[in-house]
Amino acid sequence: MAYPFQLGFQDATSPIMEELLHFHDHALMIVFLISSLVLYLISVMLTTSLTHTSTMDAQEVETIWTILPAMILIMIALPSLRILYMMDEINNPYLTVKTMGHQWYWSYEYTDYEDMSFDSYMVPTQDLKPGELRLLEVDNRVVLPMELTIRMLISSEDVLHSWAVPSLGLKTDAIPGRLNQTTLLSTRPGLYYGQCSEICGSNHSFMPIVLELVPLKYFEKWSSSML
């Protein structure tokens, strides 16, 4: 869950988000080292007298600044590709949930059940209960079992939307006429908040997403009560 004046990422709640955080730290360290080297070279140039001003060719230097950037790019690309393949992999999902974006709410359908669907609207500020979050609470939460692979099918009824839950490392575009898919797996129970992340009209800011991840036995009780 985000908090005021937060500088870093939200706590990771899925294996994918943990991998993304590790990759962020990996890439940030490379950027830090390159920036330090560039600043060092600039400071050396500014504080020393120029020498070898007549040099026209330096094969060793050209070889280094060709090979070194290539190696750095490979160090960034390989873990990035690994995470991309992990995000695209779907193995025997326990549950499939179809998500449709509308102006300006979400609708959900549990396709493994015969008649289990609902709309999810933002709770107006005047209707909030003590402890609830402004602009993030919904009237119907998406209840899902934790520690199980869930497949999300995402599309839109009208304009472009984007279904995003940062703590789970999820952000998938909802495109009219196209069905995108992603997977989620939560490592611990809790409430996880997200929002539409694609500008979709005047009420774009009022399309929150709330996932309630619970143990399997509680999910089964909830699903039985919804049927």
Curated annotation (Swiss-Prot):
Keywords for this entry? Answer: Copper, Electron transport, Magnesium, Membrane, Metal-binding, Mitochondrion, Mitochondrion inner membrane, Phosphoprotein, Respiratory chain, Translocase, Transmembrane, Transmembrane helix, Transport
Q: Which residues bind Cu cation A2?
A: 196, 198, 200, 204
Q: Which residues bind Mg(2+)?
A: 198
- In the record, Phosphotyrosine modifications are located at 218
| Protein family according to the UniProt entry | Belongs to the cytochrome c oxidase subunit 2 family.
Q: Which PROSITE patterns match?
A: COX2, COX2_CUA, COX2_TM
* TM spans (from-to): 15-45, 60-87
Mode of membrane association? Multi-pass membrane protein
Q: Which organism is it from?
A: Rousettus leschenaultii (Leschenault's rousette)
Q: Which residues bind Cu cation A1?
A: 161, 196, 200, 207
Q: How is the cofactor bound?
A: Binds a dinuclear copper A center per subunit.
Q: What is its EC number?
A: 7.1.1.9
List where in the cell it is found.
Answer: Mitochondrion inner membrane
User: What is the enzyme's main class?
Assistant: translocase
Q: How does it assemble?
A: Component of the cytochrome c oxidase (complex IV, CIV), a multisubunit enzyme composed of 14 subunits. The complex is composed of a catalytic core of 3 subunits MT-CO1, MT-CO2 and MT-CO3, encoded in the mitochondrial DNA, and 11 supernumerary subunits COX4I, COX5A, COX5B, COX6A, COX6B, COX6C, COX7A, COX7B, COX7C, COX8 and NDUFA4, which are encoded in the nuclear genome.
Parts forming coiled coils: none
Q: What protein is this chain from?
A: Cytochrome c oxidase subunit 2
Which co-factor is required? Cu cation
What is its biological role?
Component of the cytochrome c oxidase, the last enzyme in the mitochondrial electron transport chain which drives oxidative phosphorylation. The respiratory chain contains 3 multisubunit complexes succinate dehydrogenase (complex II, CII), ubiquinol-cytochrome c oxidoreductase (cytochrome b-c1 complex, complex III, CIII) and cytochrome c oxidase (complex IV, CIV), that cooperate to transfer electrons derived from NADH and succinate to molecular oxygen, creating an electrochemical gradient over the inner membrane that drives transmembrane transport and the ATP synthase.
What SUPFAM superfamilies does the record point to? Cupredoxins, Cytochrome c oxidase subunit II-like, transmembrane region
Q: Which stretches of this protein does UniProt put in the Mitochondrial matrix compartment?
A: 46-59
